[in-house]
Amino acid sequence: MRDIKDYSLKAHNTFGIEAKCARFLEYSSVEEAQEVARILRETGSPYLIIGGGSNLLLTRDFEGIVVHSAILGMWIEDDRMTCGSGEVWDEVVEASLMAGLYGAENLSMIPGDVGASAVQNIGAYGVEVKDLIREIHAVEIATGQERVIDARDCQYAYRQSRFKNEWKDRFLITSVTYQFSKTFVPHLDYGNLRENLVLGSGPKMKNFSLGPDPSAKFLREAVMRIRGEKLPDPKVEGNAGSFFMNPIVEREKYEALAATYPTMPHYEVDEGHVKIPAGWMIDQCGWKGKSLGHAGVHDKQALVLVNLGGASGQEIVVLCRAIQKNVKEKFGIDIYPEVNII
């Protein structure tokens, strides 16, 4: 177990914000997670549990304990894969395809760790990880006991789970079990995925093979290519991917807006609700490529806020609030950060 005082968190947030914590604890096994839980109980210090830092905006030093999982390992049994909470999510996607297990292709290149996937219910291109998760293994901080949590008890919804609400800071996740399909069924109906799916330098979708392999590999490569074109590399330009959640509005609200903005993109949620891309609204407000101080909006994807170099967390918050205000004024819709602001 790593136990470090006065620790820099710059390498633990993809915005690249310089901030420190009073103490940093990193566990690499269930037993070490139980030891961390004991320390948290006995010290009574405030604590923050982080993953890969790809969904985190630090606005200040954290005067408490930051906890991080470094549990690695992937174990496959039939169509299930159990992964250590410290594994990189995209490596899980790659490993699943190598094992002939399908379902996560659309979630390729989403940054972050396995543990965070279960907390955030990550999703992209019409697929959410909740559809793959079967159980979460964790240590309960209050008791130090191991728990196996059924995914059906997590109340998963769009970018939501009980881990973000009433279970917040209650568990240290040690591993997640996913259940995949042994038959490849592509999900191509969200956004511009179908039209962008080009097999290498070959033809468009009309010749797309639905066989079990290598089509899944091509789909993963297409998703990676699209994300690579639209999203900045955090190693070059600090960012947390999609900063805002796409709002879900009542159908009446959508229809009223569509009368004014007939080209407004939307996605059906259910009979009474529609999802509207926040990035489109931000773009319509003229924010794409604009900046405030050292914080900016990416010039290819308005949903992404970037650290232009030396930005503080507070500068990014100021930009966030300015965008929220403009979207509310223009569309009458509140948009909320997907990023966890500390």
Placement of each model-derived feature along the sequence:
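A common structural junction motif
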Residues: 42-46, 324-331
